Amino acid sequence: MKPWYQKAVFYHIYPLGLLGAPKTNHETSAACRFDELLQWIPHIRDLGCTALYIGPVFESTGHGYDTRDLHLVDRRLGTNEDFKNFVDQCHQHGIRVAVDAVFNHTGREFPAFRDIQEKKEASPYKDWYRGVNFGWGSPMGDSFGYEAWQGHYELPCLNL
C-alpha cells in the first residue's frame, strides 16, 4: 500500500506572500495571520486537494528560507498555537498538512551561525557549517568564509 503522500493531491501556499506579511521581520509581537488562511480550506477541498504544502513557516529574517529558529512559527504569521489551530482545522476538513522546512542551510541570524560570528574559532558550532575557513572573509563582511546555498551568502550551508 502506498503512503498517503504518494496518493495525495497537494495545494501549495506560501503564507508570507499570500498573507501580505512584511518582507523583513522586524516584528516584536506575533501577528495573527493564520486565521486569514481558514477561508482557503473549503476552496482547497473543493478543488479535490487532500493535502496542503505550506511554507516556509519557521521564524526567519526575510523570505522564510533564511531560518533563524526552527522551534517558532514566524511571528509575521502568528504563534505556534495559531499554526496548530490552523492545522487542526485542516485536519477537521480532511486535509493533511506538510510543512516546507529547510534543513540544508540556515539564515545568518540562526544561533549557531551567530555564535561563530562572535566566538570565531572558539565556537563549538564552527563544524556545523560547510567550508568554514578563518583564513578569508565572506562577501557579507564576516571574518571567516563559508559555503553558501547557491552562492547566496545570506544562506550558510549546514555541514550535513
Regions found by a protein language model. Name each.
Residues M1-V99, N104-L160:
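N-terminal structural segment of carbohydrate-active enzymes
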